[in-house]
Amino acid sequence: MKEQHNALQLMMLGLQHMLAMYAGAILVPLIVGAAIGLNAGQLTYLIAIDLFMCGAATLLQLWRNRYFGIGLPVVLGCTFTAVGPMISIGSTYGVPAIYGAIIAAGLIVVLAAGFFGKLVRFFPPVVTGSVVMIIGISLIPTAMNNLAGGEGSKEFGSLDNVLLGFGVTAFILLLFYFFKGFIRSIAILLGLIAGTAAAYFMGKVDFSEVLEASWLHVPSLFYFGPPTFELPAVVTMLLVAIVSLVESTGVYFALADITNRRLSEKDLEKGYRAEGLAILLGGLFNAFPYTAFSQNVGIVQLSKMKSVNVIAITGIILVAIGLVPKAAALTTVIPTPVLGGAMIVMFGMVISYGIKMLSSVDLDSQGNLLIIASSVSLGLGATTVPALFSSLSGAASVLAGSGIVIGSLTAIALHAFFQTKQPNSADIKT
């Protein structure tokens, strides 16, 4: 995992990872901030501190030591699972209760990381491959919505947006076809640059936010006031954290497979503890809960660059732009259809890597086929028909609201069931 690159190459590879996750990273604070009634200054702080914490959380995971850090090329960002619960808690108990709940949830994850790490035995290849496929599939609607212009856009589905998005996809594929080596490894970055340049001449690039943004923003503890602790809010946020751990587990196993590393119970424990620390810090600095971002798995697979040094650069860039809002604003000029075009390739690679992980599974086994079929179908169903569980509330709503969780739990439960019926059956080809 420690390929040698010069400083410029590392910077470009790190920038590519940052741009891939940036839209997802700023979307959550924009949604939550608007819903809980933050003013412009507060919203600016929320976006800046979120980017800063994304970088800090990523660096925590890279720092593999005795107590925490999984040491895989993983990028952490704020989890979408937290959006609904944060808005609900803020509306019911006030903004300070949001951060009290995040602090408590992070602390519990840190303390219980050893217990969560023991769950590694429930993730054989037939489960991890299915989960990675589900993660990729669940992201495709996001890619297509972005390609069309972004949900709610006045120009959603316009010919200009569709041509621009698919043009970026085609450009990235052509780079992979005609080039090798470093050019191929930064194809996503080059696609984003080329797409933004084309969008500029189409009148779709706006630099006004860059001009208006400030130069420096310093993180503050308890920016929104001292936290308050409400038991229902804490329980809800703990469920959000558990959902995030499930999503992260699939990412960890995919990256471990890509980097030819076998994950142990201790590795997962340290990964979960680092994630718990990130959630805890997110609460202290009034940011968000954090999870492993799956889109970056696609970039690692596409670029073949598996070095943690690349991701360290990504983390440093995120910390830097979190301190310099003007730099953060510069990345927002990339039009949504351009991001969508790149996402199609990235998320598609996550799906294909899940399929590759399943290639080691005995597909002559009816049990394994049923595990894959049922988990992927239910995961996809919950993603594409979110109203399916609209009658649920509370904890059940949080858990059932994620197709990744539904699919993962299905795969784990079915694998345990078939192993009980046939304890000597093997998952892996011999």
From Swiss-Prot:
<feature type="transmembrane region" description="Helical">
    <location>
        <begin position="398"/>
        <end position="418"/>
    </location>
</feature>
<dbReference type="InterPro" id="IPR017588">
    <property type="entry name" value="UacT-like"/>
</dbReference>
<feature type="transmembrane region" description="Helical">
    <location>
        <begin position="122"/>
        <end position="142"/>
    </location>
</feature>
<dbReference type="InterPro" id="IPR006043">
    <property type="entry name" value="NCS2"/>
</dbReference>
<protein>
    <recommendedName>
        <fullName>Uric acid permease PucK</fullName>
    </recommendedName>
</protein>
<keyword id="KW-1003">Cell membrane</keyword>
<feature type="transmembrane region" description="Helical">
    <location>
        <begin position="233"/>
        <end position="253"/>
    </location>
</feature>
<comment type="similarity">
    <text>Belongs to the nucleobase:cation symporter-2 (NCS2) (TC 2.A.40) family.</text>
</comment>
<feature type="transmembrane region" description="Helical">
    <location>
        <begin position="18"/>
        <end position="38"/>
    </location>
</feature>
<feature type="transmembrane region" description="Helical">
    <location>
        <begin position="43"/>
        <end position="63"/>
    </location>
</feature>
<keyword id="KW-1133">Transmembrane helix</keyword>
<feature type="transmembrane region" description="Helical">
    <location>
        <begin position="209"/>
        <end position="229"/>
    </location>
</feature>
<feature type="transmembrane region" description="Helical">
    <location>
        <begin position="274"/>
        <end position="294"/>
    </location>
</feature>
<comment type="function">
    <text>Uptake of uric acid.</text>
</comment>
<keyword id="KW-0812">Transmembrane</keyword>
<feature type="transmembrane region" description="Helical">
    <location>
        <begin position="333"/>
        <end position="353"/>
    </location>
</feature>
<feature type="transmembrane region" description="Helical">
    <location>
        <begin position="369"/>
        <end position="389"/>
    </location>
</feature>
<dbReference type="GO" id="GO:0042907">
    <property type="term" value="F:xanthine transmembrane transporter activity"/>
</dbReference>
<feature type="transmembrane region" description="Helical">
    <location>
        <begin position="310"/>
        <end position="330"/>
    </location>
</feature>
<feature type="transmembrane region" description="Helical">
    <location>
        <begin position="163"/>
        <end position="183"/>
    </location>
</feature>
<keyword id="KW-0813">Transport</keyword>
<dbReference type="InterPro" id="IPR006042">
    <property type="entry name" value="Xan_ur_permease"/>
</dbReference>
<keyword id="KW-0472">Membrane</keyword>
<feature type="transmembrane region" description="Helical">
    <location>
        <begin position="97"/>
        <end position="117"/>
    </location>
</feature>
<feature type="transmembrane region" description="Helical">
    <location>
        <begin position="185"/>
        <end position="205"/>
    </location>
</feature>
<dbReference type="GO" id="GO:0005886">
    <property type="term" value="C:plasma membrane"/>
</dbReference>
<feature type="transmembrane region" description="Helical">
    <location>
        <begin position="67"/>
        <end position="87"/>
    </location>
</feature>
<dbReference type="Pfam" id="PF00860">
    <property type="entry name" value="Xan_ur_permease"/>
</dbReference>
<dbReference type="GO" id="GO:0042906">
    <property type="term" value="P:xanthine transport"/>
</dbReference>
